[in-house]
Amino acid sequence: RGLGDVYKRQDLDEYQNNFSSYLVGLGTVDGVIYGGANAANLKSIVWYQPAEFEARGYSVPATWDEMIALADQIVADGMNPFCFGMYSNGASGWLATDWMEDIMLRTGDGVDSYDKWVTNELKFADPIVKNAATLLSQIMHTEGYVVGGTDAIVSTYFGNAQDPMFSKDANGNPGCFMHRQASFITSFWPESAQGQAGVETTVFPFPSVDASLPAAALGGGDMWAAFNDREATKVVAEYLLSADFHAPAAQMPNNARMSAHTGFDQTLYSNDLYRVMGETISAALSANSFRFDASDLMPPEVGGGSFWKEMMNLAVNGPGYIDE
């Protein structure tokens, strides 16, 4: 059913104001709003441990070039800068699409070229997309960058990819220093690391690539739809679209799902890390610089098919594969 059939406030202006025109548009077909926005997760982040950086004099990178310089320094110091694993059974490859998407938002024309890429107006063969793949390949294929190399990239389960960050070698060095992954990954952390989010382990924003482009945030999230207009359905719809809905979850210590409601009380999050993530999503939605995961928006045979497969092929075959 259209949202107007079940939302007690028949005027949907309030809903559209609270959840941004971008998210509202994702749930709209032929002018009718069917999907109601709900929770969101933040993907434009890189996990790291401040104490490990500080002990070695490393600085948090704000730009791609700074991140590459840091990676080179870590390799020169005899360690691996990145954890990276994208095995996910039949969905293997999706993690690399997230890297591509973050790079796409920060190159070319930013959100404009990103949106055209999603709708196939901008082809995968376009130089903007090839450039994003080239930058991703730099992370994948530079010797020493990824713990375990490309073999580990294609064979390590994504939920275990960050584990080396939480282990130490005989010299007291972690297996890696940076792990680019969404806010939800904390639920996959090893038991010994549970409770570290926002304490021993935190995040920095995915670095800018083209400094002339405004900041953007990549994310995923949940949407819901109603299949009848019963009174009980209307009551649930009212609650789901309220700023109160996410409050109980936000106060859970390991909650990694943020409210997509721009009026949500950010002070309710369980710690400063999640609060900053929530504020980042809210600010990006208000500035129209939040974008949903591109592969999830593309037709399934592309976003959940050939795109995933080609990311695996890129990892295996190296940068020369980009022009094949």
Regions found by a protein language model. Name each.
Residues 55-56, 191-260:
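Extracytoplasmic/periplasmic substrate-recognition and gating elements
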Residues 23-60, 68, 85-117, 218-225, ...:
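Periplasmic solute-binding protein
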Residues 86-88, 109-192:
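Extracytoplasmic ligand-binding clamshell segments of periplasmic binding protein
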Residues 1, 52-53, 69-77, 157-179, ...:
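Short helices/loops that flank or line small-molecule/ion binding pockets
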Residues 8-21, 86, 105-131, 191-196, ...:
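Short, solvent-exposed loop/beta-turn-alpha elements that line the ligand-binding surface or hinge
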Residues 2-7:
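Short, small-residue-biased leader/transition segments that mark boundaries at the very start
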Residues 34-35, 76-89, 242, 246-253:
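Bilobed periplasmic-binding protein-like "clamshell/Venus-flytrap" ligand-binding domains
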Residues 201, 250-315:
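Long, aromatic- and glycine/proline-rich binding clefts that accommodate carbohydrate-like moieties
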